C-alpha cells in the first residue's frame, strides 16, 4: 500500500488498495484488467517470502542486540532501531496478501489506518536511520583517522537521537494515517487514501512529499557525508597513525559501497516511478501492472536486506548469535 502506488487524479479516489503497484492502479478507471496467472501466483508468494525472511532476519538482529550486553554500543543502537522498523513492516505483507487474493479489504478502518502508517514508517524511517548512521560513521571514521574521540558520542545521546528520528518519522507519516479510510470502489470495499478537493493537487503533492522527504533529502545527505569524508581522508597526511587511517579508509569504502548500492538498488526504481506517474499517463496494461508490482516488491525487500547488510556482515554478530543459540540449546 505504498503511497507511490497512486495512479492519477482522474480517479474518484486518489489512491489504491493494497498491495498497490507503483505505476498504476488496477482499479484506477473502469474494470481492472485480468492479471496474468503467473503474476497472480507470484505476487503473494514473493510477499510471503519477504515477510518470512524479514521476520527471521530482524528477529535474529533483535535477539542478539537485546541479549548480548557487550553489544550495547551507539552503532548497534541505531541498528536495533532499524531492525525494529523492519520488524514492524513484516506485519504489512500478510495483510497485502489477503487483500490481493480477496480483491477487497477484509478488515476494519482502524487496521486500514494502522497498516498504512506502518507501511509509510518503512518508507521514511529506514532511510532516516541510515542517514543518522552515516552521520555517525562520518564522525567516527574521521575522528579515528585523526586519532581523537568524538565528543558527546554516548549511548544516552544515541537514544535521544533515535527518539528524535521516530518523532520526525511519526510527524511525516501522520498525514497518510489521517487520509486513510475505507471506501467503496466498483462495489468492493477498499483501504484507500481519500484526499480533499482539489484531488489533482493533493495527489501530486503526496507524491512529491514522499519523493523529497523520503528519498531526495536523506540520500543527498548520505552522498554528501561520504563524499566529504572520502575527500577529507585523502587530504590527511600519513604519519605515525597511518595504520588507523588505512583501516578508516577501508571501513568507509565498504560502508559507501554497501549503503549506497543497496539504497539505490531498492529505492531508486520506487521513487523514479513517482516521476513517471507525475509526468506520463501510462495505459494499465498487464506489463505495466507487472512492472509496478515488481518495483513495489523491490522496495518491500528493503526489510529483508537490512539485517544482512548491517548485522550479518559483522563477524562479531555471527559469533554472538551462535553463542546465544548455544546457550539456549544447552539450557
UniProtKB/Swiss-Prot annotation:
The subcellular localization recorded is: Cell membrane
Which residues does the entry place in the Cytoplasmic compartment? 67-75, 136-160, 228-251, 302-331
Family annotation (Gene3D superfamilies): Rhodopsin 7-helix transmembrane proteins
Q: Which UniProt keywords apply?
A: Cell membrane, Disulfide bond, G-protein coupled receptor, Glycoprotein, Membrane, Receptor, Transducer, Transmembrane, Transmembrane helix
| UniProt keyword annotation of DNA-binding present | no
Disulfide-bond pairs as recorded: 112-191
Query: What InterPro entries does the entry give?
Result: GPCR_Rhodpsn (IPR000276), GPCR_Rhodpsn_7TM (IPR017452), Neuropept_B/W_rcpt (IPR009150)
What cellular-component terms does GO give this entry? Answer: neuron projection; plasma membrane
- UniProt-recorded Gene Ontology molecular function terms: G protein-coupled receptor activity; neuropeptide binding; neuropeptide receptor activity
Describe its membrane topology.
Multi-pass membrane protein
Asked if the keyword Disulfide bond belongs to this entry, the reply reads yes
Residue numbers on the Extracellular membrane side: 1-43, 101-115, 181-205, 277-286
BP GO terms, sorted? neuropeptide signaling pathway
Q: Which domain of life is it from?
A: Eukaryota
Name listed for the protein in its UniProt record: Neuropeptides B/W receptor type 1
Give the organism the record lists: Bos taurus (Bovine)
Sites where a glycan is attached = 3, 13, 27
> What are the transmembrane regions?
44-66, 76-100, 116-135, 161-180, 206-227, 252-276, 287-301
A matching Pfam family: 7tm_1
